[in-house]
Amino acid sequence: MKTLKFNKKYYLPILNGDKTQTLRKDNKRLNEGETVKAVFPGTGLTCKIRILKTGYKQFQYIDDEDVKREGFHSMVELENELLRIYPKCDRFTRLYYYRFKVL
């Protein structure tokens, strides 16, 4: 089974259904309908998620729906988190999205 790593701070938001998408700079080659093991390094915590939709968009086209799916309260919050993780992002950077649900 493929794995997808998440920061431990996202464990509860994912389990609670508050975070239903992840944006990544790298293409993780996950397919719609695929079951994946979500891992939270350093915690021993895992859960299974099903990939519902995949795609990509440029950083500049992140919208309010992405903010909600990512579990953030504002565009600024999400942009700051993405820039913390990927400091070399600019508005043209391609980000892959993976929408999912916990099984």
Can you say where each PLM-predicted feature lies in the sequence?
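Structured alpha/beta reader/binder surfaces that contact nucleic acids or chromatin modification marks
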Residues: 1-103
